[in-house]
Curated annotation (Swiss-Prot):
Known function: Receptor for glucocorticoids (GC). Has a dual mode of action: as a transcription factor that binds to glucocorticoid response elements (GRE), both for nuclear and mitochondrial DNA, and as a modulator of other transcription factors. Affects inflammatory responses, cellular proliferation and differentiation in target tissues. Involved in chromatin remodeling. Plays a role in rapid mRNA degradation by binding to the 5' UTR of target mRNAs and interacting with PNRC2 in a ligand-dependent manner which recruits the RNA helicase UPF1 and the mRNA-decapping enzyme DCP1A, leading to RNA decay.
Protein name: Glucocorticoid receptor
Annotated Gene3D superfamilies: Erythroid Transcription Factor GATA-1, subunit A (3.30.50.10), Retinoid X Receptor (1.10.565.10)
Gene encoding the protein: nr3c1
Location(s), subcellular: Cytoplasm; Nucleus; Mitochondrion; Cytoplasm, Cytoskeleton, Spindle
Domain notes: Composed of three domains: a modulating N-terminal domain, a DNA-binding domain and a C-terminal ligand-binding domain. The ligand-binding domain is required for correct chromosome segregation during mitosis although ligand binding is not required.
Coiled-coil parts of chain: none
């Protein structure tokens, strides 16, 4: 019994506590995440040492008094003090009224004074842990200014009020002793290496807690919410989780453990990350799985374990306590920094091999591994085949091309309807309203049948492919029925018939696809015919045919590769050639060259040819149809010759893209030769046929020249009162000066001048 009437326990020793300036400042500011840089100073009471009053902190409003010395004579034993601590801790969890805060502060200060007085009377040779205090050296750390959000586990923050100022004065009483004031500690984290000693493992192991202590009955106090102006209320797990997520900080868990022989208070602080500059690696000492901020410096407190160690001495969670780390999302920055380092350092300073993935704690390993590992790839289903026409999902190979069912039916109806309308190969009734470049997809494939049919032909669809497929299937069945099958190479050759046509669309098939339909004139045959009315109707029909010819020319393969000025020049010079050649073909097909079939509803017979200004024109046009009858021109030959007429008149100065023009013209000359070979089985007559057809093309220059003179005369002579459509009038106005000054020239096949030969 000391003079103050204070009893000592039989286990006398030293007690450690941590007091942080950041926590003291937090008690006045009420903000744990402030921007001030704080440096924590460890306070230690050693037996036998004299108490030293701490420095007066006038900046924080602290006046050191002798309150704790006066309270040390209360006659309390350490067991009674701990019972009071437990009672106060339990009482702190219950809702308190603002007027009870003063009593709570006084009880807390009374405990501090009792422990301080007990430390003065302890003998130097005993400790709570059963070891002399001189077995390990003192190690302190100066936290870097980056640690702004760390909570100090040895203090409780309260709101800012005048009562708090008085209570905090007693917290730093005269009996509080700071032995670190005598030490001249460095101010940077890198200078602390000299304080680390070789027996650091002994220091860390001395702070370990045995499993027996953890298996006893533990009592916990929940974190206290003191953010409402100094009113401290306990919160349940749901409110605690909400406050933790809103505040973005980690709350400490204060655990009270009691043993039969030894009674002490253990403050388990959360594990944080200690950053070392060696090889950019990181050391993690974990006691509780509480997350820390990205910029927090390392500190060591409580039991220490090597990184990734799954030990049984970790702090056990009670049934009513939820894991604290479950309230926080995993921190990817910790794992990223571990992955960047070459390795890690354990708590004892031993270097271990590096791991590819780092975890904040063993308890969080399943979650971290689940989040770090990439999700298993979903088994990809069967790849969908795309229709080559409309890009829809293909249903199979139809007519030699991978297409959908809609395009299959469309192509079949288009080709069969085309053949049903004409006994021989003819033209379909599809006409593009645009520029023959419409987009054909799943949504817009029904907007333009002409472009859709052209795309089917470009993809290589062919009705003969279905027959060839059946032939291949029959051949395959016959080869399987043979007793001795031939070698694989011979069998593969036998499956392919020799007469199998090409699935790639030919130039002739494209020319058939883009050929314009016949245009009706709308002429009223019930009214008596006059030259003016008849010529006006023919001019109006010619204007419509010119528009159709422009669309047809733009759809020609290779024509749009020419310069735009060259395209306009060729159309202006050859529009009447195209109209006359088409008129001769229709007259040959429908009237066998006896009459002029301008349109299905307008046929010029002998009576109409006798009208004024009609005889000369009709005689020139009948010559063309007569040549068709004499030569029995096929449809394929007609299509190729029509393209060559478009390319038969050019300016004398040449075109801007002359090389491209020459290549295109030579291509269609070869196509004409292919059409001749397709028609004539006798190869000896092919060259003769080619000569006859090219002579017909040259004769078109003379026949159309006479028609142009009549057209120009009718256009200039206003007394005839012949109406010309706007587009046709514009073309004639541009073409007339060129023909008068002779700035254009024809391209002939059989001219005497070899310079004009192709």
């Amino acid at each position: 019994m000391d003079p103050g009437g204070l009893k000592h326990s039989k286990d006398k020793g030293l007690a450690f506590g941590k007091l942080s300036e950041s926590s003291v400042e937090g008690s006045f500011s009420g903000d744990t995440g402030g921007s001030k840089s704080t440096t924590s100073t460890s306070l230690m009471h050693l037996p036998g040492s004299r108490p030293q009053p701490p420095a007066r902190d006038s900046a924080n409003g602290l006046n050191v008094t002798t309150t704790q010395m006066e309270l040390s004579t209360g006659g309390l034993t350490i067991e009674e003090a701990e019972v009071k601590v437990m009672e106060k801790a339990i009482r702190m969890q219950q809702p308190q009224k603002p007027q009870q805060n003063q009593q709570l502060f006084e009880n807390f200060a009374l405990l501090e004074a009792s422990i301080a007085d007990l430390n003065r009377s302890n003998t130097p040779g005993s400790s709570v842990l059963g070891r002399p205090h001189d077995l390990f050296s003192l190690k302190t750390e100066n936290f870097s200014p980056m640690d702004k959000d760390r909570l100090d586990m040895g203090s409780v923050s309260f709101g800012q009020s005048q009562k708090d100022l008085d209570v905090n004065e007693r917290l730093l009483g005269d009996n509080t002793m700071d032995i670190l004031q005598d030490l001249d500690l460095p101010g940077s984290l890198s200078d602390l290496n000299e304080f680390y000693v070789s027996d650091e493992a002994a220091f860390l192991s001395s702070l370990s807690v045995e499993d027996v202590l953890l298996e006893d009955g533990n009592m916990e106090t929940k974190p206290i919410d003191c953010s409402n102006g100094g009113n401290c209320t306990n919160v349940d797990s749901a409110d605690q989780q909400k406050q933790l997520l809103e505040a973005g900080v980690s709350m400490p868990v204060i655990k009270t453990e009691e043993d039969a022989d030894t009674s002490f208070i253990q403050l388990c602080t959360p594990g944080v990350i200690k950053q070392e500059n060696d090889r950019r690696s990181f050391c993690q000492i974990s006691s509780l799985d509480l997350p820390s901020t990205h910029n927090s410096a390392g500190s060591i407190s409580g039991p220490s374990y090597p990184y990734g160690a799954n030990t049984s001495t970790a702090v056990s969670l009670q049934q009513d306590q939820k894991p604290v780390f479950g309230l926080y999302p995993p921190l990817p920055s910790v794992s990223d920094s571990w992955n960047r380092g070459n390795g890690y350092a354990t708590g004892s300073g031993m270097s271990s091999s590096s791991f590819p993935v780092g975890f904040s704690s063993p308890k969080a390993r399943p979650e971290a591994s689940g989040s770090a590992s990439s999700a298993p790839a979903k088994p990809s289903g069967p790849t969908h085949k795309i229709c080559l026409v409309c890009s829809d999902e293909a249903s199979g190979c139809h007519y030699g091309v991978l297409t959908c069912g809609s395009c299959k039916v469309f192509f079949k109806r288009a080709v069969e309807g085309w053949r049903a309308r004409q006994n021989t190969d003819g033209q379909h009734n599809y006409l593009c309203a645009g520029r023959n470049d419409c987009i054909i997809d799943k949504i817009r494939r029904k907007n333009c049948p002409a472009c859709r049919f052209r795309k089917c032909l470009q993809a290589g669809m062919n009705l003969e492919a279905r027959k060839n497929k059946k032939l291949i299937r029959l051949k395959g069945q016959q080869t399987t029925m043979e007793p001795n099958p031939p070698p694989p190479d011979e069998r593969a050759c036998a499956l392919i018939p020799k007469s199998m046509p090409q699935l790639v669309p030919t130039m002739l098939s494209l020319l058939k696809a883009i050929e314009p339909e016949a245009i009706y004139s709308g002429y009223d045959s019930t009214i008596p015919d006059t030259s003016t009315r008849l010529m006006t109707t023919l001019n109006r029909l010619g204007g419509q045919q010119v528009v159709s010819a422009v669309k047809w020319a733009k759809s020609l393969p290779g024509f749009r590769n020419l310069h735009l000025d060259d395209q306009m020049t060729l159309l202006q010079c050859s529009w009447l050639f195209l109209m006359s050649f088409g008129l001769g073909w229709r007259s040959y097909q429908q009237c066998n060259g006896g009459m002029l079939c301008f349109a299905p509803d307008l046929v010029i017979n002998d009576e109409r040819m006798k009208l004024p200004y009609m005889t000369d024109q009709c005689e020139q046009m009948l010559k063309i149809s007569t040549e068709f009858v004499r030569l029995q021109v096929s449809y394929d030959e007609y299509l190729c010759m029509k393209v060559l007429l478009l390319l038969s008149t050019v300016p004398k100065d040449g075109l801007k893209s002359q090389a491209v023009f020459d290549e295109i013209r030579m291509t269609y000359i070869k196509e004409l030769g292919k059409a001749i070979v397709k028609r004539e089985e006798n190869s000896s007559q092919n060259w003769q046929r080619f000569y006859q057809l090219t002579k017909l093309l040259d004769s078109m220059q003379e026949m159309v020249g006479g028609l142009l003179q009549i057209c120009f005369y009718t256009f200039v002579n206003k007394s005839l009162s012949v109406e010309f459509p706007e587009m046709l009038a514009e073309i004639i106005s541009n073409q007339l000066p060129k023909f008068k000054d002779g700035s254009v020239k024809p391209l002939l096949f059989h001219a005497l001048n070899h310079d004009t030969m192709p």
